[in-house]
Curated annotation (Swiss-Prot):
Its EC number is 6.3.2.2. This is Glutamate--cysteine ligase. Keywords: ATP-binding, Glutathione biosynthesis, Ligase, Nucleotide-binding. Pathway: Sulfur metabolism; glutathione biosynthesis; glutathione from L-cysteine and L-glutamate: step 1/2. It comes from the Bacteria. Belongs to the glutamate--cysteine ligase type 1 family. Type 1 subfamily. It catalyses: L-cysteine + L-glutamate + ATP = gamma-L-glutamyl-L-cysteine + ADP + phosphate + H(+). GO terms for biological process: glutathione biosynthetic process. GO terms for molecular function: ATP binding; glutamate-cysteine ligase activity; metal ion binding. The keyword Protein transport does not apply. GO terms for cellular component: cytosol.
C-alpha cells in the first residue's frame, strides 16, 4: 500500500495536464572493467592505443589504473539505445586488445601484489599529470587493491516538464533551480534510507579471491571453495562493505544532504582541512610528490558515496562550484556491482527498476536526515552486504527491528503504484512487470543476483577467478560475433583520432609549470 503522500503525488500527476510530465527521463552509464590477460591475470599493458587518448576520449577512458577501463555512454532517453551503445564500445575495445579480456565481475582476482596494478597515465599536460598524481595519492592513502574494484554508475535526470509540474502542484515559492536541487536532495535522502534494497537485489560480489585480502585479517564468516575462493554464503555485495570501495577510512566525514549549501560546505571542509593521517606524505609542492595535497580529501571526487548530486562542470570548475553556480542537474548512482549475468555489466531490467525506484524516492515524502539516521542507514547496508540473504534477517527501521522481508514487501507495494503511473505515462507495461517479478525476490533470495551467483559458483566447482574467466571468454566471443548497432566502427575510429589530436593540443597549449597550474587550481584568485 502506497503511503498517503506518495498516493497524493501520483494522483496529482495523473490528471490530464500533468499525465506525461515524467516522459523524457534521461540516463547515462559508466561501466568499469579490468583488462585481463587470457590466463586471468591483470594486464600490465598500457591503455590500448587503438582506442585513443584516455584523457580526451569521451566514450572510452581509464579509471584508477591503466588496466581499469571505463566505458561512458552519451545521455539518452532510450534505455535500449544506451545498452546497445555499451555493447558497441566494448566490442570496439576488445578488437583493439589482442588476446586480452574484460573482467566480468566487480572484485579483482589473480593479483599477487598491489604494485602489479599500474596507475593510469594521461600524458604530459598539466591536467593529465594532475589526474595521475591524484591516483598516486589514492594508492598511497587506500592501497591499489581497493581501487581495482569495478562498478557501474547509473546517471539519471528527470525532465523539466516533471519539475515544472511538481513546482506548480506544490505551490512552491522557490525558484525552479532551487526547487530542482531540493528535489534531487530529497531523492538522495530516500535513496540512502533504502539503499540496502539495491544491495539485496543487485549485489553480485559475494565472493572474492583470497589474494584480494593481501594478508589482511577479517572477521567475516567466509566459506572456502577450491584453492583460493572466499565467499559469504548469504552475503550480497562485498564491494559495498568495509572490504570494498566505500572505505572505512572516510567514515568520519560528515557530509549531509538536507540542503545544497550544507552538502557543499561538508565537502569543501574535507578538501580544505589538513589530514592527521596523510600529512606525512609529500604533496605537489615537493620534488617527489606522493599525493596532490595533504588534506582529508585531495579533491572532491575522492569522497566515496553510493549516490552523488552532479552538474556538468565548466573547464577548470570544481564539482561543488558547478553545483553552486546552477544547482543539481542529475544524480549519479554508484551502488551497482558489475552484473555478471550481462555481457555489458548491466541489463534492461535494472534500468526499469531504477527508473521506478528513483521516481519513488523523488515523489515520496523525504524528511531531513540527521547524522544518526545516516549512520543507521549505513549500518543497514552493512548488514545486507554481509548477510542479506539470511532467513528472518532484521534491519533497523527507525530504531525498531524490522525484517528485511516485511520492509521489502512494503517498499514493493509502493513501487507497484509508481510503476502503474509510469506505464500509463509511457504507454508501456514493462515497469509494472519488472516490479512484479522482482517483488518475488524478497521472499526468494535465491533469485537475487548474489543468490544466483553463489549457486552457480558452487555448482561449477571452480574457483571464483576461473569461473569469472570462463564468463569473460564467453562474453568476448559474443561481442566478436555481434554487429555494431548504434555507433559505427568508422565513427568510433574518428573519436580515436580526435581524442589523440585533442590531447596533443592540450599538451602544446600549456603555458605554466605543473606547480603553478595546481597553485591556481587549489587557490583560484
Amino acid at each position: 500500500m502506497a503511503t498517503h503522500d506518495l498516493t497524493n503525488a501520483l494522483d496529482a500527476l495523473s490528471v490530464t495536464q500533468h499525465k506525461h510530465a515524467i516522459n523524457g527521463i534521461k540516463r547515462g552509464i559508466e561501466r568499469e572493467s579490468l583488462r585481463i590477460k587470457s590466463d586471468g591475470v591483470i594486464s600490465a599493458q598500457k591503455h590500448p592505443e587503438g582506442v585513443g587518448s584516455a584523457l580526451t576520449n569521451g566514450q572510452i577512458t581509464t579509471d584508477f589504473s591503466e588496466s581499469l577501463l571505463e566505458f561512458i555512454t552519451p545521455v539518452s532517453e532510450s534505455s535500449t539505445q544506451t545498452l546497445q551503445q555499451l555493447k558497441d564500445l566494448q566490442k570496439f575495445t576488445l578488437e583493439k586488445m589482442g588476446d586480452e579480456l574484460l573482467w566480468p565481475i566487480s572484485m579483482p582476482c589473480f593479483i599477487e601484489h598491489q604494485d602489479d596494478i599500474v596507475i593510469a597515465q594521461f600524458g604530459s599536460s598539466n591536467v593529465g599529470q594532475m589526474k595521475t598524481l591524484y591516483r598516486e595519492g589514492l594508492k598511497n592513502r587506500y592501497g591499489s587493491m581497493m581501487q581495482a574494484i569495478a562498478g557501474v554508475h547509473f546517471n539519471i535526470s528527470f525532465p523539466d516538464s516533471l519539475w515544472q509540474s511538481l513546482h506548480t502542484l506544490k505551490n512552491s515559492d522557490l525558484s525552479l533551480e532551487d526547487f530542482i536541487s531540493d528535489g534531487y536532495l530529497a531523492l538522495i535522502r530516500n535513496f540512502k534510507r533504502e539503499l540496502w534494497l539495491i544491495s539485496y537485489l543487485f549485489g553480485a560480489s559475494p565472493a572474492l579471491c583470497s589474494s584480494f585480502l593481501q594478508g589482511r585479517k577479517t572477521d567475516l564468516p567466509f566459506k572456502k571453495l577450491g584453492k583460493g575462493t572466499l565467499y559469504l554464503e548469504v552475503g550480497t555485495a562485498l564491494r559495498l562493505g568495509n572490504l570494498g570501495y566505500t572505505n572505512s577510512a572516510q567514515s568520519s566525514l560528515r557530509v549531509m544532504y538536507n540542503s545544497l549549501d550544507e552538502y557543499v560546505a561538508g565537502l569543501k571542509k574535507s578538501i580544505n582541512t589538513p589530514s592527521d593521517i596523510y600529512g606525512n606524505l609529500d604533496d605537489y609542492t615537493s620534488e617527489n610528490p606522493k599525493q596532490l595535497n595533504k588534506n582529508i580529501l585531495q579533491i572532491e571526487n575522492e569522497f566515496y558515496s553510493p549516490i552523488r548530486p552532479k552538474r556538468n562542470a565548466k573547464n577548470g570548475e570544481t564539482p561543488t562550484d558547478a553545483l553552486l553556480r546552477a544547482g543539481i542537474e542529475y544524480v549519479e548512482i554508484r551502488a551497482l556491482d558489475v552484473n555478471p549475468f550481462s555481457e555489458v555489466g548491466i541489463d534492461i531490467e535494472q534500468f526499469h527498476f531504477l527508473d521506478v525506484f528513483l521516481t519513488y524516492c523523488l515523489l515520496k515524502s523525504s524528511p531531513a536526515m540527521d547524522w544518526e539516521e545516516q549512520t543507521r542507514s549505513t549500518e543497514n547496508l552493512d548488514t545486507v552486504v554481509n548477510k542479506g540473504r539470511e532467513k528472518g534477517l532484521e534491519l533497523n527501521y527507525f530504531n525498531q527491528p524490522r525484517t528485511l522481508q516485511s520492509w521489502g514487501e512494503d517498499i514493493f507495494s509502493q513501487l507497484s503504484e509508481v510503476a502503474k503511473y509510469m506505464d500509463t505515462a509511457y504507454g508501456v507495461s514493462y515497469y509494472s512487470s519488472t516490479i512484479e517479478r522482482m517483488a518475488t525476490w524478497i521472499n526468494n533470495p535465491g533469485l537475487t543476483y548474489s543468490g544466483r551467483y553463489v549457486a552457480e559458483l558452487e555448482a561449477s566447482g571452480l574457483d571464483n577467478g576461473h569461473y569469472a574467466l570462463a564468463i569473460a571468454e564467453k562474453y568476448k566471443q559474443s561481442h566478436q560475433a555481434a554487429d555494431y548497432q548504434v555507433f559505427s566502427k568508422q565513427w568510433l575510429e574518428e573519436q580515436v583520432t580526435r581524442s589523440n589530436d585533442a590531447q596533443r593540443a592540450i599538451e602544446q597549449s600549456d603555458s605554466v609549470s605543473f606547480t603553478a597550474f595546481l597553485n591556481a587550481y587549489f587557490d583560484p584568485k
